[in-house]
Amino acid sequence: MYPKFKATKYALLVLIVSVISFPFLQGEKYPSFNLEGTDGKQYHQIQFKEKEFICIILYSNHCKISQSFEGLIKEISEHLVSENSILLLVSPNNENALLPDELAYSDVGDSIKEMRIRSKDRNFEFPYLYDGLEQSISNQLSAKSTPHAFLFNKTRNLVYSGRIGDYNEPNNLKKSDLYQTYRSARNSAQINQVVTKVHGTAIKTKEDIFIANEVRRRYSEESVNIRSINQQTLKFFLKYNLGKTTLFYLWSAKDESSRENLLILSETFKIFRKRGLKLFTINVDKDQKETKLQLEKAQLSASNFILPGNEISPLVRYIPNNTTRVTPLTLLFSKEQQTLVSKIGAIDSLMLKRLILKDLKTSNIKNGRY
């Protein structure tokens, strides 16, 4: 049906296989770069010439394995800084090449703007550099996935290439291959190169944008259906559809934030639906044609309903007390049927994603891929 997309299946398979790889030391040298950091500064390789050791870690915001090592990365950085060395965190992904459901384990993507959010939230005190346009560092180092750590000594010879630490104990400094190699290299004049297998998610480049665009096009062609329900049907949905992380959105096309909210919900649903998120939109307008048009513009192929405004009483108890408005109402229920969000007005996309993630509970990092 989609000949161009079918032609890319082999390429997609290669991407999936490459996330578990054994890096080879091919005489890689300390890479040259000129990259922007999350602090707005430009970073060049020669400005670290006085440092004894330089550690470069390729990391992805969206990669759950990268995330699991954040605490250890910070701890290793503290040791390096105290000994006139430095750790550079580098994001090599082109954010436009990510598929929606590849973001299902993260509150943010891999753009420089989202890197700033992650850096601030996690209190990164080391340079966090964006290399998503050209992958200059990962290309020079022949890296294929994140996380991937590289360690260079005073003469800028590569002494380590591989994983950050033990995947089963990602916060254990004693089991960190990277840190133990650093300690050994500091205490030895001999260059002993260490290589370990890396396990993570494939680096996304501009060559992968075509696949991502094809997937987005297929999403845009999904059918958007809408049907009328009554109060009894709404009660049924509220009673029997709250066993999973569930969103309800009560809205009117007249709402000031209607269009933006629908776009946020559409994006959020595409990201998390494969992990089990359920979404019900309920419109209180009488114009079914206009309602469907708004949903189609937002490409919102969830469970969409129209319900007369005088039959929304099952939802009234969830409306915040400090408002006289009924729409737009966003409700997020946990798996245990607790109300996580009950808000009138504009949707806070970042806050919503974080609450959804917390309820979905990230699966064991040993799964590797998702």
Language-model features, listed with the residues they occupy:
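Bacterial N-terminal signal peptides
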Residues: 11-20
